[in-house]
UniProtKB/Swiss-Prot annotation:
Name by which UniProt lists this protein: UPF0340 protein LACR_0494
Family, similarity comment: Belongs to the UPF0340 family.
Superkingdom field: Bacteria
Protein's organism: Lactococcus lactis subsp. cremoris (strain SK11)
InterPro entries reported for this sequence: Antibiotic_NAT-like, DUF436
Length: 180
């Protein structure tokens, strides 16, 4: 796989998704990543540390530059736990759990984030305002209600299907209510 091309395509996708989701500084963005799918394989069966490193590095830098927190979802072997900065866990009072991600228990995205983050910790539950799913990893459980699908500029990254979610407040009150 051409890693330079992957880097460029990842940048195009994350820039587009951030524009469409309108996520703000201080908010949380969740990433689900199957490097196996990006690599043209079946999720969980062809993990690539190099692919994870490229994708997470681009997304982490882009979000950090905007003051947005990145949460990287693990695979099902870690119950889809999330790797985040300890600062965020403390700020949100999210319970920290003990595990160090590995390529086949957590995934390439978590391994890359573990190396990039200043003080990485794992938590089991978060509420993110938006997210990006590379390879059909099912990030919806981590995105705040009400979730709205976002169609990224590219539907694929390598061999992986790409989708995204944003959220909005619930509309309550029925026909008498007014909304912005």
């Amino acid at each position: 796989m051409d890693l330079e091309k992957l880097k460029e395509e990842t940048q195009i996708i994350i820039d587009d998704v951030l524009k469409q989701t309108e996520i703000k500084s201080g908010q949380v963005f969740v990433l689900g990543l199957s490097s196996s799918e990006v690599n043209g394989g079946l999720i969980g069966h062809a993990s690539s540390a190099e692919i994870g490193q490229v994708i997470v590095s681009v997304i982490h830098k882009t979000l950090s530059d905007k003051g947005i927190y990145l949460a990287v979802q693990a695979c099902e072997h870690l119950n889809r736990a999330l790797l985040i900065e300890e600062e965020l866990a403390d700020k949100k009072d999210w319970e920290i759990v003990s595990v160090v991600p590995q390529l086949h228990a957590g995934g390439s995205g978590q391994v890359a984030a573990y190396q990039l983050f200043k003080s990485p910790v794992e938590v089991e539950h978060i509420v993110a305002q938006a997210g990006l799913d590379i390879g059909d990893t099912s990030i919806g459980m981590h995105v705040k209600h009400v979730q709205i699908p976002v169609r990224p500029i590219s539907k694929e990254l390598g061999g992986a299907h790409v989708t995204s979610l944003k959220s909005r407040p619930k509309l309550i009150g029925g026909e008498r209510a007014r909304y912005e």
